[in-house]
């Protein structure tokens, strides 16, 4: 019973961490759109909270293994949590990177409307949320949907890269802002990759199937 209680509390901490990551992505995107330096700095400072949560959750996992010597499903869940909090922490770092770029981009007028970037932001926030839920609830179907969304993010990233190249070719003075936007898009793309890792961990936890670096398709397709 003690293991069950501690494991449930640890799961709640993972969900809390995921929500903080989503908030960081949301605020970083808003800071970018509104050229709000103060909000961007808030994201940067808030990353410390995400880092501390990672350390706390990792310690909880080590404690549960040492104290209760869990087996089978409980052990897989604990080891899975230990792994995915690293991905969540990296997502927080990427949100911080977006905020740092937002500060640099606030120095000049926007190069273009951030339509694709905003779309990427919404998708990756959904991926973060759904990947963690799929892991906690061992929902393989939801995990596979998360993995499929990564292709959409990749396509948006490449589409934006082509568009930014056009801006640079039209006027070389655009290169600085285009470079910053390219990095911003790359940071979103990396968040999606980490969410995909979490979803893959969910599938392994539920089915025992290693799906890393594979394209997931529904059975029968």
Swiss-Prot record:
GO molecular function: protein homodimerization activity
Entry keywords, A to Z: Cytoplasm, Phosphate transport, Transport
A Pfam family of this chain: PhoU
GO term, biological process aspect, one: intracellular phosphate ion homeostasis
Principal location: cytoplasm
Subcellular location: Cytoplasm
Transmembrane segments: none
InterPro entries named among the record's database cross-references: P_transport_PhoU, PhoU-like_sf, PhoU_dom
GO cellular component: a single term: cytoplasm
SUPFAM superfamilies: PhoU-like
Protein family membership: Belongs to the PhoU family.
Role noted for this protein: Plays a role in the regulation of phosphate uptake. In this role, it may bind, possibly as a chaperone, to PhoR, PhoB or a PhoR-PhoB complex to promote dephosphorylation of phospho-PhoB, or inhibit formation of the PhoR-PhoB transitory complex.
Subunit structure: Homodimer.
Protein name listed in UniProt: Phosphate-specific transport system accessory protein PhoU homolog
Organism whose genome encodes this protein: Aquifex aeolicus (strain VF5)
Lineage of the species this protein comes from: Bacteria, Pseudomonadati, Aquificota, Aquificia, Aquificales
């Amino acid at each position: 019973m003690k293991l069950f209680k501690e494991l449930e509390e640890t799961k709640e901490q993972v969900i809390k961490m995921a929500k903080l990551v989503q908030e960081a992505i949301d605020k970083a995107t808003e800071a970018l759109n509104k050229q709000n330096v103060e909000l961007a700095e808030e994201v940067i400072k808030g990353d410390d909270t995400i880092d501390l949560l990672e350390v706390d959750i990792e310690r909880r996992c080590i404690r549960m293994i040492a104290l209760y010597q869990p087996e089978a499903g409980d052990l897989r869940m604990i080891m899975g949590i230990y792994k995915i909090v690293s991905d969540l922490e990296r997502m927080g770092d990427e949100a911080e990177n977006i905020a740092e770029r937002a500060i640099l981009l606030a120095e000049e007028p926007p190069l273009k409307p951030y339509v694709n970037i905003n779309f990427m932001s919404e998708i990756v926030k959904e991926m973060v949320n759904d990947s963690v839920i799929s892991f906690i609830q061992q929902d393989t179907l939801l995990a596979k949907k998360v993995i499929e969304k990564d292709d959409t993010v990749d396509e948006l990233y490449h589409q934006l890269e082509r568009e930014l190249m056009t801006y640079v070719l039209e006027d070389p003075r655009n290169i600085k802002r285009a470079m910053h936007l390219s990095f911003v898009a790359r940071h979103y793309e990396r968040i999606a990759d980490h969410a995909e890792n979490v979803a893959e961990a969910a599938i392994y936890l539920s089915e025992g199937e290693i799906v890393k670096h594979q394209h997931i398709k529904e059975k029968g397709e």
